A protein has these predicted regions:
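Hydrophobic packing positions in regular secondary-structure scaffolds
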Residues: 1-264
Length: 264
């Protein structure tokens, strides 16, 4: 309803874009930074795409200097290939600082698009834990599910009750956005899935094994990304678990994963 006081998303972006261009033109960096920091990463990505190369680099550099996390999240939304071209002008040690704050699958998406010598230098400069996580994903062949999965996937033991599962979920730091709750055995084999809604509706003493679905769609780490995208489209999934050759849960691909479902 045009009279309800809200503004359509595309109109908000148009207003933001006009303001960015105006503030850049008059050199009002402080005001420009304030405006950029109020934007959602996806909106910033659209703004980046509408600016000239020079203005885009200027806005990005300003944001990187003051709010690097927001800048990097916007670049992930912007697309790895375009974003890597913007980042390639920065020194490896600085890129390492920015990239190591991202989830490893996001970092891999950007590092994959950097020139080989620069990506190698970046990996050397990253913290051991961060570079190790990234290098583990880089070991998977390009165009495979393993290459784009997020290895930080929350899983529940099949021995839990619904109440215990809810407690585990509340106490986990790995959970960003839960679409499905995957259930594993003591050796981390993927054995089932349960929705959060289902978990909340049953009695707390109900065993997970009684309410989980054992017939679930998954991808192997070596599954081609196009096949993954087709599964997601065919079954209307928000996320898909990734397993290794022993059917152990290795990661997850969501519709938030960079370039994951671009083929759908």
């Amino acid at each position: 309803d045009p009279d309800d006081g809200t503004m359509p998303p595309h109109r908000r972006i148009d207003v933001g874009l006009d303001s960015v261009k105006r503030l850049q033109r008059i050199g009002a960096s402080a005001n420009l930074l304030n405006l950029l920091q109020k934007q959602h990463p996806a909106d910033l990505a659209e703004v980046f795409g509408e600016l000239s190369d020079k203005d885009c680099r200027g806005a990005l550099t300003l944001l990187l200097d003051h709010n690097s996390r927001l800048a990097m999240e916007a670049l992930i939304e912007y697309g790895a290939e375009h974003s890597a071209a913007l980042l390639a002008d920065h020194p490896a040690d600085q890129l390492a600082v920015w990239l190591q704050e991202l989830p490893s699958d996001d970092a891999v998406a950007l590092i994959d698009e950097l020139p080989d010598d620069l990506s190698a230098a970046v990996l050397e400069q990253m913290r051991p834990q961060a570079s190790g996580d990234v290098e583990n994903l880089l070991e998977y062949a390009e165009e495979t599910a393993g290459r784009i999965m997020n290895p930080m996937v929350f899983a529940l033991s099949e021995d839990l009750t619904a109440g215990e599962a809810i407690g585990a979920l509340q106490g986990s730091r790995e959970v960003e956005m839960v679409f499905y709750l995957y259930v594993v055995d003591e050796r981390r084999h993927l054995v089932g899935v349960v929705s959060l809604r289902r978990l909340l509706l049953v009695a707390t003493e109900t065993p997970l094994q009684r309410i989980m679905t054992t017939d679930l769609i998954s991808a192997r780490v070596d599954t081609d990304q196009e096949e993954v995208a087709q599964h997601v489209a065919s079954y209307n999934l928000l996320a898909i678990p990734v397993v290794d050759e022993e059917n152990k849960l290795a990661g997850i691909i969501t519709d938030q994963s960079p370039d994951a479902f671009a083929l759908t």
